Amino acid sequence: MTELARLKFYATQPHSCSYLPDEQATTLFLDPSQPMDVHVYADLSEMGFRRSGDHLYRPHCQNCNACVPARIPAARFIPNRQQRRILKRNADLTVTAARPAFKEEYFDLYRRYIETRHADGDMYPPSRDQFSTFLVRDLPFCWFYEFRLAGRLLAVAVCDLLPNGLSAVYTFYEPDEERRSLGRFAILWQITEALRQDLEAVYLGYWIKNCKKMNYKTQYRPIELLINQRWVTLN
């Protein structure tokens, strides 16, 4: 483990929670002057931290612990019948790793995805600056995985390649290809890629029991939840 005790962290003032409208949220951030070291990041991911843009953070709320870090142990994952169908349905896609960059092709897909799927969220309306600040970061461990059908871009999974696993930062995809279940397929592909690279887990961020948008995460079994500073398996 990295000497995490030497790191500095800062907490935000309470603000409206993005997921539970009746709650106030507080976020703990790693000191932004701390270099984004991949080993520090990996150690912090074991403690429930996530990356957004150039920042590592985790919830630090006074009166709520609803946000539970979740990860899929790649070697123990077993796809269910629906997931096997999704894998078969998307077997015609090719996946290519690319360095983070701003491309109109990426932004057009991102814009249509946000406008169609998340028009009620805090990422609407999408903008080029928002896209770049959130996703296009010059970090050596960050990758854009492009999912294409005969050259046509259908999805992009933004992932961080860490020593202990893949951290799924964000996925955006073609909203008109609903039958393909591209968001679910992207997670299934990342599990397969983690296995191929002999990585321990795919980190999915936070699961919130009373948030419908988070329900999909527990469809991948077994899944591990960070409870009382221990990763506990949910079969």
From Swiss-Prot:
Functions in the N-end rule pathway of protein degradation where it conjugates Leu from its aminoacyl-tRNA to the N-termini of proteins containing an N-terminal aspartate or glutamate. HAMAP family: Bpt. It catalyses: N-terminal L-glutamyl-[protein] + L-leucyl-tRNA(Leu) = N-terminal L-leucyl-L-glutamyl-[protein] + tRNA(Leu) + H(+); N-terminal L-aspartyl-[protein] + L-leucyl-tRNA(Leu) = N-terminal L-leucyl-L-aspartyl-[protein] + tRNA(Leu) + H(+). It comes from the Bacteria. It is an enzyme of class 2 (transferase). It comes from Pseudomonas putida (strain W619). This is Aspartate/glutamate leucyltransferase. GO terms for molecular function: arginyl-tRNA--protein transferase activity; leucyl-tRNA--protein transferase activity. Keywords: Acyltransferase, Cytoplasm, Transferase. InterPro entries: Acyl_CoA_acyltransferase, Asp_Glu_LeuTrfase, N-end_Aminoacyl_Trfase, N-end_Aminoacyl_Trfase_C, N-end_Aminoacyl_Trfase_N. Belongs to the R-transferase family. Bpt subfamily. It is found in: Cytoplasm. SUPFAM superfamilies: Acyl-CoA N-acyltransferases (Nat) (SSF55729). Pfam families: ATE_C, ATE_N. One of its GO terms (cellular component) is cytoplasm. GO terms for biological process: ubiquitin-dependent protein catabolic process via the N-end rule pathway. Its EC number is 2.3.2.29.
